Amino acid sequence: MKAAVLQEKRSLEIKEIPDPGSPGPNYLRVKIISVGICGSDVHYYTDGRIGDFDVENPMILGHEACGSVEEIGKGVHGFQVGDLVALEPGVPCNSCQYCFTGMYNLCKKMRFWATPPIDGALTEYVLHPASFTYKLPDDLDPSVGPLIEPLSVAVHAARKTGVETGDVVFVNGSGTVGCLVSVVSKMAGAHKVISSDNNDNRLELARSMGVDKAINIESENLQSEVFKYTDGMGVNIAFECSGNN
Protein backbone atom coordinates (compact mmCIF):
# COMPACT_ATOMS: atom_id res chain seq x y z
CA MET A 1 0.00 0.00 0.00
CA LYS A 2 1.01 3.64 -0.35
CA ALA A 3 1.88 6.15 2.35
CA ALA A 4 3.11 9.75 2.54
CA VAL A 5 6.49 9.37 4.24
CA LEU A 6 8.54 12.24 5.61
CA GLN A 7 12.04 11.13 4.64
CA GLU A 8 13.72 14.12 6.22
CA LYS A 9 13.07 17.82 6.66
CA ARG A 10 11.18 19.15 3.60
CA SER A 11 11.29 15.79 1.84
CA LEU A 12 7.91 14.03 1.60
CA GLU A 13 7.57 11.00 -0.67
CA ILE A 14 4.72 8.67 -1.63
CA LYS A 15 6.17 5.23 -0.96
CA GLU A 16 5.09 1.61 -0.99
CA ILE A 17 5.03 0.15 2.52
CA PRO A 18 3.85 -3.23 3.87
CA ASP A 19 0.10 -3.72 4.26
CA PRO A 20 -0.82 -4.05 7.97
CA GLY A 21 -2.89 -7.17 7.30
CA SER A 22 -5.91 -8.36 9.26
CA PRO A 23 -6.81 -6.98 12.68
CA GLY A 24 -6.11 -8.90 15.85
CA PRO A 25 -8.54 -9.20 18.78
CA ASN A 26 -10.21 -5.90 19.74
CA TYR A 27 -8.81 -4.15 16.66
CA LEU A 28 -10.28 -2.86 13.41
CA ARG A 29 -8.78 -2.60 9.96
CA VAL A 30 -9.73 0.83 8.65
CA LYS A 31 -9.41 2.18 5.13
CA ILE A 32 -8.29 5.79 5.45
CA ILE A 33 -10.49 8.23 3.50
CA SER A 34 -9.31 11.65 4.66
CA VAL A 35 -6.59 13.08 6.88
CA GLY A 36 -6.28 16.60 8.24
CA ILE A 37 -3.00 18.50 8.08
CA CYS A 38 -2.27 19.83 11.56
CA GLY A 39 0.24 22.49 12.49
CA SER A 40 2.40 19.76 13.99
CA ASP A 41 2.58 18.03 10.60
CA VAL A 42 3.70 21.29 9.03
CA HIS A 43 6.38 21.79 11.69
CA TYR A 44 7.74 18.27 11.26
CA TYR A 45 7.88 18.89 7.51
CA THR A 46 9.49 22.33 7.62
CA ASP A 47 11.71 21.96 10.70
CA GLY A 48 12.10 18.22 11.20
CA ARG A 49 11.19 18.58 14.86
CA ILE A 50 8.84 19.97 17.49
CA GLY A 51 10.41 20.70 20.85
CA ASP A 52 12.16 17.55 22.03
CA PHE A 53 10.65 15.40 19.28
CA ASP A 54 13.07 14.99 16.38
CA VAL A 55 12.36 13.14 13.15
CA GLU A 56 15.45 10.92 13.17
CA ASN A 57 14.04 8.28 10.82
CA PRO A 58 11.44 8.33 8.02
CA MET A 59 7.95 8.80 9.46
CA ILE A 60 4.38 8.84 8.15
CA LEU A 61 2.62 12.10 9.01
CA GLY A 62 -1.02 12.77 9.93
CA HIS A 63 -2.97 12.24 13.15
CA GLU A 64 -6.42 13.62 12.28
CA ALA A 65 -8.08 10.78 10.37
CA CYS A 66 -11.41 9.53 9.09
CA GLY A 67 -12.01 6.21 7.37
CA SER A 68 -14.31 3.24 6.85
CA VAL A 69 -14.23 -0.09 8.66
CA GLU A 70 -12.97 -2.81 6.32
CA GLU A 71 -12.43 -5.74 8.67
CA ILE A 72 -13.38 -6.46 12.29
CA GLY A 73 -11.22 -8.35 14.77
CA LYS A 74 -12.45 -10.88 17.32
CA GLY A 75 -14.13 -9.48 20.40
CA VAL A 76 -15.19 -6.24 18.73
CA HIS A 77 -18.85 -5.24 19.03
CA GLY A 78 -20.82 -2.26 17.78
CA PHE A 79 -19.16 -1.92 14.38
CA GLN A 80 -20.06 -3.13 10.91
CA VAL A 81 -17.99 -3.28 7.75
CA GLY A 82 -18.49 0.01 5.93
CA ASP A 83 -19.04 2.14 9.03
CA LEU A 84 -17.65 5.66 8.73
CA VAL A 85 -15.36 6.28 11.69
CA ALA A 86 -13.06 8.82 13.31
CA LEU A 87 -9.86 7.57 14.90
CA GLU A 88 -8.42 8.80 18.19
CA PRO A 89 -4.70 9.24 17.45
CA GLY A 90 -3.30 8.59 20.91
CA VAL A 91 -3.36 5.03 22.24
CA PRO A 92 -2.27 4.58 25.89
CA CYS A 93 -0.82 1.54 27.64
CA ASN A 94 -4.02 0.80 29.60
CA SER A 95 -1.95 -0.53 32.50
CA CYS A 96 -0.60 2.49 34.41
CA GLN A 97 -2.12 4.57 37.19
CA TYR A 98 -3.14 7.33 34.77
CA CYS A 99 -4.98 4.84 32.57
CA PHE A 100 -6.63 3.15 35.57
CA THR A 101 -7.98 6.49 36.82
CA GLY A 102 -9.35 7.65 33.47
CA MET A 103 -6.57 10.15 32.76
CA TYR A 104 -5.08 8.14 29.93
CA ASN A 105 -4.14 11.33 28.10
CA LEU A 106 -1.27 11.61 30.61
CA CYS A 107 -0.01 8.06 30.00
CA LYS A 108 3.79 8.07 29.82
CA LYS A 109 3.70 5.23 27.29
CA MET A 110 1.21 6.92 24.97
CA ARG A 111 1.69 6.01 21.31
CA PHE A 112 0.51 9.08 19.41
CA TRP A 113 0.29 9.08 15.63
CA ALA A 114 2.86 11.13 13.73
CA THR A 115 4.93 11.79 16.85
CA PRO A 116 8.46 10.39 16.42
CA PRO A 117 9.00 7.51 16.18
CA ILE A 118 5.30 6.56 15.75
CA ASP A 119 3.89 6.58 12.22
CA GLY A 120 0.70 8.49 11.40
CA ALA A 121 -2.35 8.04 9.20
CA LEU A 122 -1.36 9.43 5.78
CA THR A 123 -1.56 5.92 4.40
CA GLU A 124 -4.17 3.64 2.85
CA TYR A 125 -4.93 1.32 5.77
CA VAL A 126 -4.37 1.19 9.52
CA LEU A 127 -5.06 -1.27 12.31
CA HIS A 128 -6.60 0.56 15.25
CA PRO A 129 -8.09 -0.39 18.64
CA ALA A 130 -11.88 -0.48 18.44
CA SER A 131 -12.05 1.30 21.82
CA PHE A 132 -10.35 4.33 20.25
CA THR A 133 -12.51 4.31 17.13
CA TYR A 134 -15.76 6.28 16.93
CA LYS A 135 -18.69 5.85 14.58
CA LEU A 136 -19.75 8.88 12.57
CA PRO A 137 -23.13 9.51 10.90
CA ASP A 138 -23.37 7.71 7.58
CA ASP A 139 -24.37 10.91 5.79
CA LEU A 140 -21.42 12.95 7.11
CA ASP A 141 -19.05 14.25 4.45
CA PRO A 142 -15.85 12.23 5.09
CA SER A 143 -13.76 15.28 4.25
CA VAL A 144 -14.80 16.89 7.54
CA GLY A 145 -14.37 13.70 9.57
CA PRO A 146 -10.78 14.54 10.58
CA LEU A 147 -12.08 17.68 12.32
CA ILE A 148 -13.45 15.44 15.06
CA GLU A 149 -9.95 15.36 16.57
CA PRO A 150 -9.44 19.14 16.95
CA LEU A 151 -13.13 19.47 17.84
CA SER A 152 -12.50 17.20 20.82
CA VAL A 153 -9.80 19.65 21.95
CA ALA A 154 -12.34 22.48 21.86
CA VAL A 155 -15.00 20.47 23.69
CA HIS A 156 -12.50 19.53 26.41
CA ALA A 157 -11.45 23.17 26.82
CA ALA A 158 -15.04 24.39 27.10
CA ARG A 159 -15.92 21.67 29.61
CA LYS A 160 -12.81 22.30 31.70
CA THR A 161 -13.52 26.03 31.98
CA GLY A 162 -17.24 25.51 32.45
CA VAL A 163 -18.53 27.78 29.69
CA GLU A 164 -22.25 28.29 30.24
CA THR A 165 -25.19 30.51 29.44
CA GLY A 166 -24.41 34.21 29.73
CA ASP A 167 -20.63 33.99 29.65
CA VAL A 168 -18.56 36.47 27.66
CA VAL A 169 -15.70 34.55 26.07
CA PHE A 170 -12.48 35.77 24.49
CA VAL A 171 -10.56 33.48 22.11
CA ASN A 172 -7.04 34.56 21.16
CA GLY A 173 -6.26 33.01 17.79
CA SER A 174 -8.67 32.22 14.96
CA GLY A 175 -7.05 29.16 13.45
CA THR A 176 -8.72 25.75 13.40
CA VAL A 177 -8.71 25.20 17.16
CA GLY A 178 -9.60 28.82 17.92
CA CYS A 179 -12.61 28.77 15.59
CA LEU A 180 -13.78 25.45 17.02
CA VAL A 181 -13.42 26.75 20.58
CA SER A 182 -15.55 29.73 19.55
CA VAL A 183 -18.23 27.49 18.04
CA VAL A 184 -18.32 25.17 21.06
CA SER A 185 -18.50 28.16 23.42
CA LYS A 186 -21.53 29.49 21.55
CA MET A 187 -23.16 26.07 21.63
CA ALA A 188 -22.49 25.89 25.38
CA GLY A 189 -24.49 29.09 25.83
CA ALA A 190 -21.94 31.91 25.76
CA HIS A 191 -23.69 35.25 25.33
CA LYS A 192 -20.81 36.83 23.42
CA VAL A 193 -17.68 35.39 21.84
CA ILE A 194 -14.83 37.71 20.89
CA SER A 195 -12.00 36.45 18.70
CA SER A 196 -8.65 37.99 17.81
CA ASP A 197 -5.96 37.31 15.22
CA ASN A 198 -3.55 39.17 12.95
CA ASN A 199 -4.92 37.53 9.79
CA ASP A 200 -8.03 39.02 8.18
CA ASN A 201 -8.89 35.80 6.34
CA ARG A 202 -8.97 33.87 9.59
CA LEU A 203 -11.03 36.58 11.25
CA GLU A 204 -13.53 36.44 8.40
CA LEU A 205 -13.77 32.68 8.86
CA ALA A 206 -14.36 33.20 12.57
CA ARG A 207 -17.20 35.62 11.79
CA SER A 208 -18.76 33.14 9.39
CA MET A 209 -18.71 30.54 12.18
CA GLY A 210 -20.64 32.74 14.57
CA VAL A 211 -18.08 34.88 16.40
CA ASP A 212 -19.78 38.07 17.60
CA LYS A 213 -16.73 40.34 17.46
CA ALA A 214 -13.50 39.75 15.53
CA ILE A 215 -10.49 41.96 16.24
CA ASN A 216 -7.32 42.33 14.18
CA ILE A 217 -4.62 42.89 16.78
CA GLU A 218 -2.28 44.56 14.28
CA SER A 219 -4.71 47.29 13.24
CA GLU A 220 -6.87 47.62 16.36
CA ASN A 221 -6.20 48.04 20.08
CA LEU A 222 -7.30 44.76 21.60
CA GLN A 223 -8.00 45.98 25.11
CA SER A 224 -9.96 49.06 24.10
CA GLU A 225 -11.99 47.11 21.52
CA VAL A 226 -12.90 44.41 24.03
CA PHE A 227 -14.01 46.92 26.67
CA LYS A 228 -15.88 48.98 24.09
CA TYR A 229 -17.76 45.93 22.83
CA THR A 230 -18.61 44.71 26.34
CA ASP A 231 -19.63 48.13 27.68
CA GLY A 232 -16.60 48.19 29.97
CA MET A 233 -17.29 44.80 31.53
CA GLY A 234 -14.57 42.78 29.80
CA VAL A 235 -14.73 39.00 29.57
CA ASN A 236 -15.00 36.29 32.21
CA ILE A 237 -13.44 33.40 30.26
CA ALA A 238 -10.43 33.53 27.93
CA PHE A 239 -8.79 30.89 25.75
CA GLU A 240 -5.25 31.06 24.34
CA CYS A 241 -5.34 29.43 20.89
CA SER A 242 -2.72 31.37 18.96
CA GLY A 243 -0.18 28.56 19.07
CA ASN A 244 2.76 30.89 18.51
CA ASN A 245 6.06 31.07 20.33
Task: Give each language-model segment a name.
Residues 40-46:
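Cytochrome P450 core scaffold surrounding the K-helix E-X-X-R motif
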Residues 18, 22-35, 50-97, 137-139:
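Glycine-rich beta-strand-centered segment in the early N-terminal region that forms part
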Residues 222-232:
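Conserved amphipathic alpha-helix within the SDR
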Residues 233-239:
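Short SAM/SAH-binding signature in class I
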Residues 83, 124, 212, 236:
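Conserved acidic residues
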Residues 240-245:
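Beta-loop-alpha module in the N-terminal Rossmann-like domain of NAD(P)-dependent dehydrogenases
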Residues 93-172:
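NAD(P)H dinucleotide-binding glycine-rich loop of Rossmann-like/cofactor-binding domains
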Residues 140-220, 224, 237:
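Mid-domain Rossmann-like dinucleotide-binding core that forms the NAD(H)/NADP(H) cofactor-binding site
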